[in-house]
A protein has these predicted regions:
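TRNA-recognition modules of translation machinery and tRNA-sensing kinases, especially anticodon-binding
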Residues: 2-284
Length: 284
């Protein structure tokens, strides 16, 4: 599997699908430029998504919300306090690690610490003698939360009043514009609002190649429905998404849907799941 993946990466780089970002200046880790073929491929996927999710369903509309939003949006959504990763430093080699990923890696994925408290993760790492993957040491600092949003400043002053964030997801723009869309298009629920756009997350442990990058593009739709019908609609859209992926060429034998356990759900969710393809996870 690893050799096959390496061949795919090599082919993508050599044929103009993807280039290393800032390559002639030494590159910048976790950044990638899409070449001519890469752009065409992305555009075809986005066109297919727009056609299936927006154009073929009269209940759904598309918007383009701003990347920069009033910080009160992120305060109201809980991102300022809750959108964070649990980090530990190795005191021996000074490397930084996500506590949850240390546990998942050490247990070969058999233990999922999502929803655990910092204390529970610290105790598990200590009791199971989980070592630093870089030096093999067992001396970690206490866990602290690191916010994943990129912070910058609006205007000429760099102070608290000028603080602004690059959006970590596209969803909030659709929530904020819900009333505007409903009024302008005289929509009645159920209906969906979709958009395609860039999002940014200051990932501590980015993934391999173009997976889990700090700058990425999302195709997302928020579907608004009457209370009490949400689980029915969830079931409908879950199958809809799976059908869309297989129609794009995904092999059904290599795909499965995993419902998240209750302890994995964030405070905003009643139900959630993900499509899993050969251990590569694509969030629904």
């Amino acid at each position: 599997m690893e050799k096959t993946f390496d061949k795919i990466v090599s082919h993508a780089k050599n044929t103009g699908f993807v280039f290393q970002g800032s390559e002639i200046y030494g590159g910048l880790s976790n950044t990638w430029d899409f070449g001519p073929y890469g752009v065409l491929l992305k555009d075809h996927i986005k066109d297919a998504w727009q056609k299936k999710f927006i154009q073929e369903d009269s209940n759904n509309v598309e918007i383009q919300a701003a990347i920069l939003m009033n910080p009160k949006v992120w305060e109201a959504s809980g991102h300022l306090k809750g959108f964070s990763d649990p980090l530990m430093d190795c005191r021996q080699c000074k490397t930084r690690h996500r506590a949850d990923q240390l546990i998942e890696t050490a247990t070969n994925g058999e233990v999922n610490p999502e929803g655990w408290t910092n204390e529970e993760m610290e105790n598990f790492i200590r009791d199971h003698h989980i070592a630093c993957p870089d030096c093999g040491g067992h001396d970690f600092t206490p866990i602290r939360q690191f916010n994943l949003m990129f912070k910058t400043f609006q205007g000429t002053l760099e102070d608290g009043k000028s603080t602004i964030y690059l959006r970590p997801e596209t969803a909030q723009g659709m929530f904020v514009d819900f009333k505007n869309v409903q009024r302008a298009y005289r929509k009645k629920i159920p209906f969906g609002i979709g958009q395609i756009g860039k999002s940014f997350r200051n990932e501590i442990t980015p993934g391999n190649f173009i997976f889990r990058t700090r700058e990425f593009e999302q195709m997302e739709m928020e579907f608004f429905c009457k209370p009490g019908t949400d689980l029915d609609w969830f079931t409908y859209w879950r199958q809809f998404c799976m059908d869309w992926i297989t129609n794009l060429g995904g092999n059904p034998e290599n795909l499965r849907f995993r419902d998240h356990e209750k302890e994995e759900l964030s405070y905003t969710l009643e139900k959630n799941g993900e499509v899993i393809a050969n251990n590569n996870v694509a969030k629904e």
